Amino acid sequence: MTEPTYIPLRLHTEFSITDGMVRIKKLIAKAQEYGLPALGISDLMNEFGLVKFYKACRSAGIKPIGAADVRIGNPDAPDKPFRAMLIIRNDAGYLRLSELLTAAYVGKDRNVHHAELNPEWLENGDNSGLICLSGAHYGEVGVNLLNGNEDAARTAALKYAAWFPDAFYMELQRLPERPEWEACVSGSVKLAEELGLPVVATHPTQFMSRDDFNAHEARVCIAGGWVLTDKKRPRDFTPGQFFIPPETMAERFADLPEALENTVEIAKRCNLHITLGKNFLPLFPTPDGLSLDDYLIKLSNEGLQERMVQLYPDEAERAAKMPEYQERLDFELNIIIQMKFPGYFLIVQDFINWAKTHGCPVGPGRGSGAGSLVAYSLKITDLDPLKYALLFERFLNPERVSMPDFDVDFCQSNRGRVIEYVREKYGAEAVSQIVTFGTMSSKAVIRDVGRVLELPFMLCDKLSKLIPLEANKPLSLEKAMETEPQIQELIEAEEADELITLAKKLEDLTRGLGMHAGGVLIAPGKISDYSPVYQADESASPVSMYDKGDVEDVGLVKFDFLGLRNLTIIEMAQNNIKNTTGDIIDVGKIPLDDQVAYQIFRDANTTAVFQFESTGMKKMLKTAHTTKFEELIAFVSLYRPGPMDNIPDFVARMKGQEFQYIHPLLEGILAPTYGIMVYQEQVMQAAQIIGGYSLGGADLLRRAMGKKKPEEMVKHREIFAEGAAKQGISREKSDEIFNYMEKFAGYGFNKSHAAAYALISYQTAWLKAHYPAEFMAATMSSELDNTDQLKHFYDDCRANGIEFLPPDINESDYRFTPYPDMKIRYALGAIKGTGEAAVESITAARQSGGKFTGLLDFCERVGKEHMNRRTLEALIRGGAFDSIEPNRAMLLANIDLAMDNADQKAANANQGGLFDMMEDAIEPVRLIDAPMWSESEKLAEEKTVIGFYLSGHPFGPYAQEVRQIAPTKLDRLKPQDSVRLAGFVTAVRTMMGKRGKIAFVSLEDLSGQVEIMVGGQTLENCADCLKADQVLIIESKVSRDDYGGGDGLRILANQVMTLQTARERYARSLSLALAPHHDIGGLVRLLAAHQLPDTPRIPLQLSYANEKASGRLQVPPKWTVTPSSALFGELETLLGSRSVRVNW
């Protein structure tokens, strides 16, 4: 093999985030094409891609060289740090670079404005494992050379040479587009000769080919928030910064062959080694010098004794059951110790039990871990695995060595406290969370590139929305253009070729950094000994620079601390119950056979019930009539694509339909699911019973079936048949059973996970059944910012007889508050425009000074720090001041006056003396008067901040009237050929169907809401009247819809009318209710104007009421009016909608 002439060392991959678009896979392929024996990457201030690069190089037979392009602090110009490249020579260098990068992001003396290395760290630390390149024209030497300051350049070179003895190289770069760099090259060569330093040639690679330059510029603009045409934006890169072949470098540095030779020399000096596949658990302290094994055995046996007392209070029954449990416990402990995982179990039980004893609710289990009796004994999980036939081997298989993985659900609001406990126990440097990489999906990249190209938002938005989804993920641009012809048509029509060209090059490129939802790393020392650590800013949590897959590869153990909203709801509900009733409820101790709770499921009254909220699940529950916990476990497992097909058979068999087991030997394991294979554990047990597999071997079979590898399946089929033959089962029957298992293994669910989640489902249903107001108040408090969900829960509460009390500055808190007798006080925090700090300032003022007496008093006592004009407006519009002043319009008109008055009083109070004596003499502030809003105005304003109508409903004033011609309430609909419906339109959306345009109209009355489809000629006839915030009368056909949402009804409009049109057509008379404040003269003039000749006219009926009496007025026969939209609109404006009624 010929000696290489050049090894690339300086290269930014896509993991430089703000620039660089080299994808590692393509880089390795091109390096192989160039015949490179070694290759380096040097991302900017990070090692995000190092492990991926290392593994890819090793697989391709290329020597990996790890490095980082680092910023180094510049005391003379802090906003212009110098650059250098630090290359890993050996294990010590790997640790040192990791330490330096970590310090740049999380160190106590880091630069908080941008990540950089403090020169003192380099001066005072051991850099012997690193090689340093000077940074060419961006380095301290190069910057001084280009500025003509040779003395400073010399001083800098000597400094770096001292920091990196025999490992500092003067870096040389040449680009045809950058002739100004040549001064740095010549100066560096001269200085190197003078000081006896080596030189090395690098090429600053940013992308793979020359035609990637424009895409790279777009990438830089996306990261920096610029547009491509911005003349002021940085232009740091050139088209020549692509991955060039060694021959090009040989030509460029023909006059300096030693600079090329030194790239090879550096490659030889560097031996990066990353240990992969070995796990490093933190050290768990044990008492009394016990080994980890002995301490696990001790805690497990003690925990089992405690659990057995809970499970079997009767001593005789407990004694009878104990041998079975003890045998299972000993079996599990032997495997855990054999696989060297006692430390893992001890660590997990420690932070879970800390959480449970410190007010941090923990879920009963999640994933396959609920199948472990050791976990149950240690209180890691809260479900008896023997009772529900949960298998330990599904969690930890001695025949397939891999780390156990407990997924632990914590209450969302307390999860951070548990992580903080772990930090304190093991040391902050030993704990971090895990980075995730956000990429530019096809939908996102269209919007991003469109922005930097300054294309119309509507065009990019439309293109993005045209990209179809597959399994909830957008298709690639290539596939989307093949699938959706409109994309290509739009590109051609709008001349958007450049958008697509750039977007394709950037698609799926790493765009940003995030944090893994639950993963927490605990290392047996500093995290940075295994992975550098990154922190976005002061408020963020530290994360590893390696993502989930990479940290596991380097041996760090991930512990999943997941936040589950429903645990927060349960905790809040239990607190609510204690506050309203005094009852102390622990959902972990409620009986699992309470038929009051199961009635919630039988009635499909499962809004807010964990895992059972969807329309499809409710439809299934209505037919199922469930009575026991095992059925809930099955429903959690069945209601997913694939298994859903078995729901009808499952429900029918639940109700008594006869069925046969596929083989009598399987009756024991299939009886709980009525002969249907639902769980992965059943597949494993069937393999054990029929095929003679161990449960560990059965787990391997299950995995093989799930992966559908033909060669493995052939092998397993024979093993299974041999085992079946020993049971006297024919090959034909054996193959039938195997095929049946194979079918279910593909989508069978993990029973351990289903059982744990079914338990939370049951607990939430139990709370809803026994303490509905307390539970729903907690549920709504968990969704304060989600208006759609709040409306959904509000409707459910009303359907269950819960009354809502309005928001009130003198009664409400930040969250929803339950009251006795099925009442909930609306939360101030659910009003848009408020916030927790603002509401806390209200409640604090209320607690210290009593109830507020008016707007002036409120503004004087609540600090301006959290109570700005926008928040005050929101509270008024939402009705929170109604108890002290119902005129919301007047309050809004006086906000500035009230806030100014509060400021003046505060200023006077600070002055003291004279102002104290004058306080009583100051004339009281007079509020500006303003007419009250009409009911419709009040509701419209209220909806802007509540998100829906709370104090009333805009349909209310019309309900009595329209029921004369549309008597059917929306919650009483049933399939029928023709029905006339009436309601208030809350939303209209349109879409293109197979037969043309379709509109979906959301219609509400006082009983409920439906969605009505309007299409074809009906849509053409009424397109102008399909608008939100008005009453419509709709002739409809109602049919059963087994596939749609709602209550399984499909409503199709045949005719649509506005209320005004319906009045014109069908009105028989007009009733007006008059009061003293009405303008009678104006009314007479209005009515006279609508006595149109030669038109159909209707008679008037007048009534009058004041404080003392009421009565009907005799109206002369000549007073008839022409019914019209104009008349009704003018009357409602003059008298109010409640005073105008049409009789049909």
From Swiss-Prot:
InterPro entries: DNA_pol3_alpha_NTPase_dom, DNA_pol3_alpha_thumb_dom, DNA_pol3_finger, DNA_pol_IIIA_C, DnaE2/DnaE/PolC, DNAPol_HHH, NA-bd_OB-fold, NA-bd_OB_tRNA. It is an enzyme of class 2 (transferase). GO terms for biological process: DNA replication. Transmembrane segments: none annotated. SUPFAM superfamilies: PHP domain-like. CDD domains: DnaE_OBF (cd04485), PHP_PolIIIA_DnaE1 (cd07433). Its EC number is 2.7.7.7. The keyword Membrane does not apply. Belongs to the DNA polymerase type-C family. DnaE subfamily. This is DNA polymerase III subunit alpha.
